[in-house]
Amino acid sequence: MAGGGGGGGGEGPRQLDQTPTWAVSTVCGVIILISIILELIIHKVGEVFERKKKKALFEALEKIKNELMVLGFISLLLTFGQNYIASICVPSRYGHAMSFCGPYDGPSEDDRKKLKKTDHAMRILYSVQRRSLADAPPVNCKKDYVALISLNALHQVHIFIFFLAVFHVIYSAITMMLGRAKIRGWKVWEQEVIHEQEMMNDPSRFRLTHETSFVREHVNSWASNKFFFYVMCFFRQILRSVRKSDYLTMRHGFISVHLAPGMKFDFQKYIKRSLEDDFKVVVGIRPELWAFVMLFLLFDVHGWYVTAVITMIPPLLTLAIGTKLQAIISYMALEIQERHAVIQGMPVVNVSDQHFWFEKPDLVLHMIHFVLFQNAFEITYFFWIWYEFGLRSCFHHHFGLIIIRVCLGVGVQFLCSYITLPLYALVTQMGSTMKRSVFDEQTSKALEQWHKKARKKNEK
C-alpha cells in the first residue's frame, strides 16, 4: 500500500506547478529581502569609506564586490548547466580514478549505533544514502561508462562556492582589523616624537652611532655570524616585531629622505594608509590563485597526502617573510654602525630597495597575498567538508592531523595579519620610492610645493 493521496507523507517531490503560490512567493520574498539588506550594508560601508576619504579601503571594497560577482557568475553557470554537466559520461576507468575518498563500504554496526544518537549523525547517514542514489549511472550512459559528476555532487560544489564567498569577506575583514589594531599601537610613539621634536633637533644631542638604542638592539656579537643573525631575526618577529627605536629610526629616515626638514608629518597615519593600500592588493583573487584552487582540488586524492604538504607552505612562507623583514631592519642598523660617525638626534638609515629580494618590495607583498589566500581557502575547505560530510568523514581519516592543520591556519592568519603585514607596511617605506597615492590631498599639495621650491633652488 503506497499511501496514495491521503496523508502527504508518501508523496514524492513536487514540481513548481504543484507548489502553492504562497510558498513560492514567501521563499522568493525572503531571499530577495536578505539580498537587498546585504547590498545596503555593503553600500553603507562604501559610503563611510568615501566620507572618511579612505580611498584605498573603498577600492578594496569594490574589489571584494567584484570577487563576489565572479563567484555569483560561477554559481549561475552551475545552476543553469547542471543538467547538461550531469549528462556527460566518461569511461569507468577514468570515472573512478583519483577520488577524494577510498572505496566506502558504509559504517559498521557499532558505528551505526553511535551515529544514531545525534541528529547530526543521522544527517551523515542520510547524506551517504543520498550520494549512493545520486551517483547511479544515468540512463543515457553506455555500458562501462559513468557520469562525469552527479547532480548531488554539483549541488555540493554549489555550497562550496557559497562558503568561498562568505569566508572571503570574513577573512578580509579579520585581516584588516588585526593589521589596523597593530598599527594603532604605534600612535603613542608618534605622539611622543611630535612632542619631543624640538629636543630631537637640539644640536647639543651628539652621540656615536653605536650608542643609539636602535643600533644597540640590533647589533651584537652574534650578528657577525650569518646563521645566528637569521636565528635572531626569526625569533624577533615573533617576540617583538617592531620596537620603539625601530619605529622612530625608520620614521626619521623616511622624513629625512622624502620630506622637507622640520616638516610636520604624521608617520603613523601614513603607515596606516599604506597598510590600506596594501590591503587593496591582498584582498583580490588573481587568476593564478584560481589556478592554485584547481590544483589543490585536483591533487586532494585519497592516499596521496599532497594537501598535507601544501598546508605547510603558509606557515613556512610567513615565517620566512617575517625573518627577511627583520633582517632588513638589522642590516640598516649594521650600516649605521659601519659609518663610525657622530650623529645628531636620531640616526639616519639608508633608504634603498637593495635589501629586498631581487630589489623588489612588491614581491614580498605578493607572497603575503598568496599566504593569506591559501590559508583562507584551506580553512574554508575544512568548514565546507565539516558541513557537507561531517567532522569524521573520509576526508578526515587522520583527525589529529586535521586539528593540527586548523590550528596552523588560525596561527598563520594571526601572524600574517597582525605581525607580518604591518611590519611590511613599515619596512617597505625604507624602499627607494614612496607611495604618493596614500597621502591625503593637503599633504600631497604641500609635498608638490616643496618639490617645486627645491627644484627652483637647484636650478639657481
UniProtKB/Swiss-Prot annotation:
GO cellular component, one term: plasma membrane
Chain residue ranges for the region called Calmodulin-binding: 441-460
Membrane topology, Extracellular segments: 1-21, 89-158, 311-315, 388-398
Membrane topology annotation: Multi-pass membrane protein
Gene Ontology biological process terms, A to Z: defense response; pollen tube guidance; protein localization to plasma membrane
Record's comment describing the protein's domains: The C-terminus contains a calmodulin-binding domain, which binds calmodulin in a calcium-dependent fashion.
Name under which the protein is recorded: MLO-like protein 9
